[in-house]
């Protein structure tokens, strides 16, 4: 199974740098990474070009003119350009656990999509990570976590327990952490580009 990691970004190069660095440490690499850029300035382009020099997999920068919030359109363009059979989608202000791609591939099943969650970090911890540019682990006891601590646990038995506990509350996709088959995405014509928000809910 060939995978494409799609990263959505808009004018947050400092966060994107940390995100791309976290891709380097994956236990299983995606076959390619596409940065879908909704109109960022040249600072983002320069950053991506610097990463291309020694990035472990092909790194592709797709850019569209800044005409307001057009994330759905950019994501559709990114999936259209992808060569992977399986798409993993995140936001550019996410930095990944080192088994992130491995987990998505392991759990992929025909006819299903995956919706993950995230650990929300406070402003101080976020700034520290962006400034240090050091890939680090986040634990349930890490100071600066703003949402449920269990989202920082990487353990299959524990994850299964909380998946059963919260599954009835999951009603839609989450663009910062979801994956799906490219063929399924194309079959439903992708995201609704007329929506300014909630396009993931309409798709799933």
Segments (PLM) and residue ranges:
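Cell-envelope/extracellular polymer assembly enzymes that use nucleotide-activated donors
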Residues: 2-4, 32
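Short, well-formed alpha-helical segments that are part of the catalytic scaffolds
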Residues: 12-25
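A conserved acidic beta->alpha catalytic loop
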Residues: 22, 29, 37-48, 68, ...
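Glycine-rich, basic loop-to-helix element that forms the pyrophosphate-binding segment
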Residues: 65-82, 99
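Short aromatic/hydrophobic "clamp" motif used to bind/position activated sugar donors
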Residues: 87
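Conserved donor NDP-sugar-binding/catalytic core segment of glycosyltransferases
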Residues: 99-140
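Short, flexible, basic/aromatic active-site loop/helix in glycosyltransferases
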Residues: 122, 134-170
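A short, conserved alpha-helix in the catalytic core of glycosyltransferases
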Residues: 172-173, 177-180, 184-189, 195-204
């Amino acid at each position: 199974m060939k995978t494409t990691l799609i990263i959505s970004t808009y004018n947050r190069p400092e966060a994107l740098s940390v995100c791309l660095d976290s891709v380097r440490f994956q236990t299983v690499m995606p076959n390619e990474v596409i940065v879908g850029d909704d109109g960022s300035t040249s600072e983002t382009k320069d950053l991506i070009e610097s990463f291309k020099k020694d990035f472990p997999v092909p790194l592709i920068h797709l850019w569209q003119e800044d005409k307001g919030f057009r994330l759905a359109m950019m994501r559709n363009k990114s999936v259209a350009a992808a060569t992977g059979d399986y798409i993993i989608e995140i936001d550019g202000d996410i930095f990944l656990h080192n088994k992130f791609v491995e987990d998505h591939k392991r759990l992929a099943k025909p006819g299903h999509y995956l919706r993950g969650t995230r650990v929300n970090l406070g402003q101080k911890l976020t700034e520290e990570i962006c400034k240090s540019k050091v890939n680090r682990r986040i634990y349930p006891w890490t100071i600066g976590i703003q949402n449920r601590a269990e989202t920082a646990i990487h353990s299959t038995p524990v994850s299964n327990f909380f998946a059963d506990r919260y599954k009835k509350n999951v009603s839609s996709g989450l663009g910062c952490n979801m994956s799906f088959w490219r063929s399924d995405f194309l079959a439903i014509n992708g995201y609704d580009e007329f929506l300014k928000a909630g396009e993931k809910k309409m798709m799933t």
